[in-house]
């Protein structure tokens, strides 16, 4: 880790990372990262990791119904720009930006993270309302590219849970899953040893650490913790070919994908390598796109 980052682990297993950073001024970025996503879903929960993410904005112990969004709007924050979340195969991350010039704003921000970590209420009325929102997100995402990827992923992720755990899930489960099935995922996987609180911004790091310890120290995991299922590695059994078509596709894509060993980004050197690789890919893409725009393009 960068020496300026303060890392700690609470007795309950929750990890926190604190980095004082004075640009932009008077701003604090607060994240809650959960080491669980759609890969951890049971067969009757496909799509519910993402649904759980939605429910975090629909009522908690301190902030009933949509009070989180309404409160943040009163201090100048906007949903989407300053308040957001996302779910992937392996993680669920909540992101919050608050002004740091007044202590109560940061305290409220940490209260929100604490409620997301262990006190989402799952009001049956709110669950019923949010089903339609999640189903509409599923419907709007069912374009040609998504349909092609769904087919391609069966080959790409062959032999692993990734092939059967696309994050948006299955509409019939989203539509019919009982409230308790949705809540079961939350209780199984939103537990301290699978969580990290990340605070970066223009604040006193000692005060921030004290407030994190005070708020998150009482979090408890389930009495009987489940073993966390991993996605597993796709089977590497020679060359596999996937040819997929869709009548609504607007172009042709040819890709070559290689299975390589995971390389963690655990140091500045690792991060520098990652940035260099990303820049290489961007430069190559721009050059190919520039060639493609020419009237005498060779492809």
Model-derived segments and their meaning:
Residues 1-6, 94-97, 151-195, 228-231, ...:
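Histidine-acidic residue clusters that define the catalytic metal-binding segment
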Residues 159, 196-251, 263, 290:
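An aromatic/glycine/proline-enriched structural segment found at the starts
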Residues 11, 25-27, 87-91, 129, ...:
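Short, solvent-exposed loop/turn segments at the edges of secondary structure
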Residues 31-42, 46-78, 143, 152-166, ...:
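Signal/transit-peptide handling
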Residues 34-146, 173-177, 181-194, 204-220:
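Active-site-adjacent, His/Asp/Glu-enriched structural segments that form or flank metal-binding
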Residues 15-19, 29-33, 93-97, 196-198, ...:
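Soluble periplasmic/extracytoplasmic beta-strand elements of cell-envelope proteins
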Residues 1-33:
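Mature N-terminal segment immediately following signal peptide/propeptide cleavage
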């Amino acid at each position: 880790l960068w020496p300026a980052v303060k890392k700690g682990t609470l007795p309950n297993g929750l990890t926190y990372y604190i980095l004082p950073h004075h640009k932009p001024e008077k701003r604090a970025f607060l994240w809650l990262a959960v080491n669980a996503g759609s890969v951890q879903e049971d067969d009757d929960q496909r799509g519910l990791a993402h649904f759980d993410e939605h429910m975090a904005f629909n009522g908690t112990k301190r902030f009933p119904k949509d009070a989180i969004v309404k409160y943040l709007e009163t201090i100048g924050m906007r949903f989407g720009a300053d308040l957001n979340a996302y779910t992937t195969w392996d993680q669920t991350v909540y992101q919050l930006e608050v002004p740091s010039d007044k202590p109560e704003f940061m305290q409220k921000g940490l209260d929100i993270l604490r409620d997301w970590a262990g006190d989402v209420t799952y009001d049956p009325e709110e669950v019923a309302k949010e089903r339609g929102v999640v189903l509409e997100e599923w419907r709007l995402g069912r374009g040609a590219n998504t349909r092609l990827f769904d087919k391609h992923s069966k080959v790409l992720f062959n032999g692993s849970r990734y092939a059967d755990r696309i994050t948006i899930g299955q509409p019939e489960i989203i539509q019919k899953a009982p409230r308790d099935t949705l809540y079961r995922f939350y209780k199984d996987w939103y537990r301290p040893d699978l969580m990290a609180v990340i605070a970066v911004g223009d604040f006193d790091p000692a005060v921030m650490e004290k407030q994190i310890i005070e708020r998150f120290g009482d979090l408890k995991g389930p009495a009987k913790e489940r073993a966390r299922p991993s996605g597993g590695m796709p089977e590497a059994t020679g060359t596999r070919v996937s040819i997929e078509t869709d009548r609504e596709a607007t172009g042709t894509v040819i890709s070559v994908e290689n299975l390589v060993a995971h390389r963690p980004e655990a140091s500045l050197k690792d991060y520098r390598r990652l940035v260099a690789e990303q820049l290489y890919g961007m430069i190559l893409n721009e050059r190919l796109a520039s060639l493609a725009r020419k009237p005498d393009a060779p492809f």
